[in-house]
């Protein structure tokens, strides 16, 4: 699984950072506090770690991202989320960025391969643990009508690390379980037709 960004996100209190007090000063500069967008130093990292919260770590290069995205076994996915409009741009831009930048602009993937990596490949990977995934990632009679209608000539992400909640361009309609949740590029307020996906017990 990969998403098309050179930064990751996690909690600052994660065990990943248990050795932070031994870091050189420049190691702090790759970290960004989600709530304010500020880059951190030793003092602010220690203060926020005691407080707890989300952090973005700018720890990869575009070459690393290209290698991950183009690998034949890679699926395109993101577990990112927004809280009060703050978070990682992968929450809103992952799929549009792959389609706009890595398919249309760079030609790293062809369109059908990118769509496979976003839909049927993750569904097949997960269906052994969650039977309801057999109804995802497919357009056929009886499957869940989860559909995204986009313009391949214009689709692109617009969210950033400081404005992660900006909607992508070129996504005209989104249906979840057959219900329109994005209509002519605009979010339909108050509509929540999604259902939980539960693992097999």
Language-model features: locations:
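Acidic, glycine-enriched loop/beta-strand segments at the rims
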Residues: 55-59, 65, 106-113, 124-165
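C-terminal cap of metal-dependent C-N hydrolases
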Residues: 66-73, 78-81, 147-193
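Divalent metal-coordination and catalytic microenvironments
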Residues: 1, 79, 114, 122, ...
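Active-site neighborhoods of metal-dependent hydrolases
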Residues: 2-111
